[in-house]
Amino acid sequence: MGTLSVNQNKLQKRLRRLAGEAVADFNMIEEGDKVMVCLSGGKDSYTMLDVLMHLQKVAPIKFDIVAVNMDQKQPGFPEHVLPAYLKELGIEYHIVEKDTYSVVKELIPEGKTTCSLCSRLRRGTLYTFADEIGATKMALGHHRDDIVETFFLNMFFNGSLKAMPPKLRADDGRNVVIRPLAYCHEKDIQAYSDLKQFPIIPCNLCGSQENLQRQVVKDMLIDWERKTPGRTESIFRALQNVQPSQLADRNLFDFSNLRIDETAASRFVNVVNI
């Protein structure tokens, strides 16, 4: 890639700045961390690796990066692409081979979406591998739009108010997941991926499935954004401004013991009598 144009330079700086802010805001990376960057071969994970490698050069702390891809034995998966790319970058990398493709095809009926089971199997394998190599953080490439979409998916289909946190301790307690692109827009990531000409590997297992719930939600948000620009950004800000007393979750707020403040009542009476 040659010299960047003014707009391309702004795009690169914006992605680096937003990722840096997310890392700082949530204390994602600390001195001496070994960050396992999970690469799928898609635009998001390539961009994440690119941004983290820059951050590694300019950050005031020292941390290591190791790239990891999971070969799930999908038919037609180009096994040479990622090793060639990562060798050229000159960073440590591992290819974890596990045939989850056959498991998914066996358990999921034809025509049904495979994403949920596929991601669970992949996540479990990567958690185990992170522990094996001594990784202290596991970086995933989810961006701001993914987080907002997940919020609506959980609300519409699971009856819960939750999304994807920028930083998460896994249920096993052994892994901390970070999402450095949490503040980044998907459209910027797509533009940067096109600019850098990353060697994208399509997902043959689920990439062509129609009517996925996530795609329905994505289309809804795109339509909202078209009609009311800035709405998606406002929704993301709302996830950072939760007020438990204004919801109805008794586990988050103690409604049972909510009483009038007698001292406040007496102060009001005194003010009225003055």
UniProtKB/Swiss-Prot annotation:
Motif mapping: PP-loop motif: 40-45
Name the positions where [4Fe-4S] cluster binds.
Answer: C115, C118, C206
Q: In which pathway does it act?
A: tRNA modification
Q: What keywords are assigned to this protein?
A: 4Fe-4S, ATP-binding, Cytoplasm, Iron, Iron-sulfur, Magnesium, Metal-binding, Nucleotide-binding, RNA-binding, Transferase, tRNA processing, tRNA-binding
Q: What is its EC number?
A: 2.8.1.-
Chief location of this protein? cytoplasm
MF-aspect GO terms: 4 iron, 4 sulfur cluster binding; ATP binding; magnesium ion binding; sulfurtransferase activity; tRNA binding
Q: Write down the required cofactor(s).
A: Mg(2+); [4Fe-4S] cluster
Q: Which GO terms describe its biological process?
A: tRNA thio-modification
Q: Keyword Protease, does the record have it?
A: no
Enzymatic class:
transferase
Q: Which reaction does it catalyse?
A: cytidine(32) in tRNA + S-sulfanyl-L-cysteinyl-[cysteine desulfurase] + AH2 + ATP = 2-thiocytidine(32) in tRNA + L-cysteinyl-[cysteine desulfurase] + A + AMP + diphosphate + H(+)
> Which pairs of positions does the record mark as disulfide bonds?
none
What does this gene product do?
A: Catalyzes the ATP-dependent 2-thiolation of cytidine in position 32 of tRNA, to form 2-thiocytidine (s(2)C32). The sulfur atoms are provided by the cysteine/cysteine desulfurase (IscS) system.
Q: Which family does it belong to?
A: Belongs to the TtcA family.
Q: Which miscellaneous remark does the UniProt record hold?
A: The thiolation reaction likely consists of two steps: a first activation step by ATP to form an adenylated intermediate of the target base of tRNA, and a second nucleophilic substitution step of the sulfur (S) atom supplied by the hydrosulfide attached to the Fe-S cluster.
Report the protein name in the record: tRNA-cytidine(32) 2-sulfurtransferase
Species whose genome carries this gene: Pseudomonas savastanoi pv. phaseolicola (strain 1448A / Race 6) (Pseudomonas syringae pv. phaseolicola (strain 1448A / Race 6))
